Amino acid sequence: MKPNKFQIKNTFDWYLTNVLPVVEHRAIQNKYGYHGLYTHTNAVVFRGIDYALSIEKSPEIVALACALHDIARTNDTPDPEHGQRAIPLADRIISEVPYVLTRPERDSILYAVANHTTGMLAPDYISACMWDADRTRISWECGFDAKFFTTEYAKQVSKNSPEEYLQFMRQHLSHRALRIMGELNKQY
């Protein structure tokens, strides 16, 4: 399924309005930089929404998981424990975001956040879309390896050039989103 331009744009704007302000207030991650909230995390949220729509799953739940994945990072150096450290903070943020989740959805988000650095394959669509969205940039930088991806669409995006996808992002983001994210480049 090819995601609808308005579904992506509307879901990303929902994230900017309902999720990003809570994450900005609570997260300890840097706002800019290689793992920055406004740079990397926003791009992971966008790709997560896109990947969720490609498999006809809830883009809001995936957007929330993506928004939380690096909230406990304190720098851009390798930090395999930041996912586990994020759990108490992620649980608190989930409680403050105006979106009703079932207990299994909440647990799946927390599992996805805690385990996104493990390199394993995803047990559910929330982990699949979030992990694939995060790993896409690594694939662009280090080379594509299908064994690290779950969704077919993410495999396709990850083996193509980042410039192609950045152009796709520019076409599917609102003016507000583009202002917040600034200049889109390969760092995303």
What feature does the model see in each segment?
Residues 43-51, 81-97:
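An active-site-proximal "capping" alpha-helix that borders the catalytic cofactor pocket
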Residues 38, 42-45, 63, 103-114:
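Short, well-structured alpha-helical segments
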Residues 15, 99-101:
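Short helix/loop segments within enzyme catalytic domains
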Residues 59-77, 82, 86, 108-117:
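His-Asp-centered metal-binding catalytic motifs of divalent-metal-dependent phosphohydrolases/nucleases
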Residues 29-30, 51, 71-74, 93-97, ...:
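Alpha-helix C-capping/helix-to-loop hinge sites
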Residues 20-29:
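Generic N-terminal amphipathic, Lys/Arg-enriched alpha-helix
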Residues 1-14, 28-57, 68, 118-188:
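Divalent metal-dependent phosphate-bond-processing catalytic cores, especially two-metal-ion Mg2+/Mn2+ enzymes
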